[in-house]
């Protein structure tokens, strides 16, 4: 397997801080999101970026990855993990590979009683739109085979067709019984756990079962009221902006949030007032007329008061 350069994938340097890496991740997630991007292989790029973020966003896993990267040319690393098939290292292999190289205790060579196989965890990226209904997914992972000393001797690729239920949430674990590593001496197999990762969406933020979307409006739309088209996970809707709306005001759209077995969340449109470009002479005169008509209005009247 080939150890991927996660820093290069994210377009950052190994010395960059988490804030810089997060900024790069959000930019790339927006760029390659399949619902938005028209670039070829957008989904593959998106998943690769999500995989890099999974490791680099975690302080411990990032430190372990950095150590692995430093040792990538060591003979021990090459013998165990650089196979001729050109298969790439990914985040699903991370914990097994690191512990195998840097600290897993050798197993005792004497005969052991029947023992249950190890569980395996892999992360499955799910788009927000996919959480609305049950969908099928083909997943691939590697079953590690250990030698008598507890070292990974080889990895056997395995593919499964699974169903991801509707309403899955971020961090939810789905158990696939018996799909982990084989047991020892007649013991039962371990399980495979699918850990759901809800991929970031370029428009929606998740707040519990609800969704938030920032809706840009003009000053006159906020002042006079308007109807604007707003996307949801299923379709676009016509949202009514009431007269006198304020920046940051949250408008609730019932039943347009996330779906679960117990409830359906809501969508909250957060208004963002966007000013037009620098006004020309005529436009400036109109703004001045408005200012004169509202001369008694002081937006800072209650500023700083409890």
Swiss-Prot record:
<dbReference type="InterPro" id="IPR008971">
    <property type="entry name" value="HSP40/DnaJ_pept-bd"/>
</dbReference>
<dbReference type="Pfam" id="PF01556">
    <property type="entry name" value="DnaJ_C"/>
</dbReference>
<dbReference type="InterPro" id="IPR023859">
    <property type="entry name" value="DNA-bd_curved-DNA"/>
</dbReference>
<keyword id="KW-0143">Chaperone</keyword>
<feature type="domain" description="J">
    <location>
        <begin position="5"/>
        <end position="69"/>
    </location>
</feature>
<dbReference type="GO" id="GO:0003681">
    <property type="term" value="F:bent DNA binding"/>
</dbReference>
<dbReference type="InterPro" id="IPR018253">
    <property type="entry name" value="DnaJ_domain_CS"/>
</dbReference>
<keyword id="KW-0238">DNA-binding</keyword>
<dbReference type="GO" id="GO:0042026">
    <property type="term" value="P:protein refolding"/>
</dbReference>
<dbReference type="Pfam" id="PF00226">
    <property type="entry name" value="DnaJ"/>
</dbReference>
<dbReference type="InterPro" id="IPR002939">
    <property type="entry name" value="DnaJ_C"/>
</dbReference>
<dbReference type="GO" id="GO:0005737">
    <property type="term" value="C:cytoplasm"/>
</dbReference>
<dbReference type="GO" id="GO:0009295">
    <property type="term" value="C:nucleoid"/>
</dbReference>
<dbReference type="InterPro" id="IPR001623">
    <property type="entry name" value="DnaJ_domain"/>
</dbReference>
<protein>
    <recommendedName>
        <fullName>Curved DNA-binding protein</fullName>
    </recommendedName>
</protein>
<dbReference type="GO" id="GO:0051085">
    <property type="term" value="P:chaperone cofactor-dependent protein refolding"/>
</dbReference>
<dbReference type="GO" id="GO:0051082">
    <property type="term" value="F:unfolded protein binding"/>
</dbReference>
<comment type="function">
    <text>DNA-binding protein that preferentially recognizes a curved DNA sequence. It is probably a functional analog of DnaJ; displays overlapping activities with DnaJ, but functions under different conditions, probably acting as a molecular chaperone in an adaptive response to environmental stresses other than heat shock. Lacks autonomous chaperone activity; binds native substrates and targets them for recognition by DnaK. Its activity is inhibited by the binding of CbpM.</text>
</comment>
<keyword id="KW-0963">Cytoplasm</keyword>
<dbReference type="InterPro" id="IPR036869">
    <property type="entry name" value="J_dom_sf"/>
</dbReference>
């Amino acid at each position: 397997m080939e150890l991927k350069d996660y820093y290069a994938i994210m377009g950052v340097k190994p010395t960059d801080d988490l804030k810089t890496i997060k900024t790069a991740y959000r930019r790339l997630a927006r760029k390659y999101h399949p619902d938005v991007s028209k670039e070829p292989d957008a989904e593959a790029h998106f998943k690769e970026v999500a995989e890099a973020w999974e490791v680099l966003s975690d302080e411990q896993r990032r430190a372990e990855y950095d150590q692995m990267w430093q040792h990538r040319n060591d003979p021990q690393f090459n013998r165990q993990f650089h196979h001729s098939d050109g298969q790439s290292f990914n985040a699903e292999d991370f914990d097994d590979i690191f512990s195998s190289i840097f600290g897993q205790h050798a197993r005792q060579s004497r005969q052991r009683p029947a023992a249950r196989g190890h569980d395996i965890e892999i992360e499955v990226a799910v788009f927000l739109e996919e959480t609305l209904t049950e969908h099928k997914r083909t997943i691939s992972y590697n079953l590690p085979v250990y030698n008598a000393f507890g070292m990974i001797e080889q990895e056997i690729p395995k593919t499964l067709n699974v169903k991801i239920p509707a309403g899955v949430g971020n961090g939810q674990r789905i158990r696939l019984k018996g799909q982990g590593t084989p047991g020892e001496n007649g013991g039962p197999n371990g399980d495979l756990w699918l850990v759901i990762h809800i991929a970031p969406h370029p428009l929606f933020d998740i707040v519990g079962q609800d969704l938030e979307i920032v809706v840009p409006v003009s000053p006159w739309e906020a002042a006079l009221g308007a109807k604007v088209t707003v996307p949801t996970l299923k379709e676009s809707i016509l949202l009514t902006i009431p007269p006198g709306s304020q920046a940051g005001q949250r408008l609730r759209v019932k039943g347009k949030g996330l779906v679960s077995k117990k409830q359906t969340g809501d969508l909250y449109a957060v208004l963002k007032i966007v000013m037009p470009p620098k006004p020309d002479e005529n436009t400036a005169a109109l703004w001045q007329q408005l200012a004169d008509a509202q001369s008694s209005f002081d937006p800072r009247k209650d500023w700083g008061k409890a």
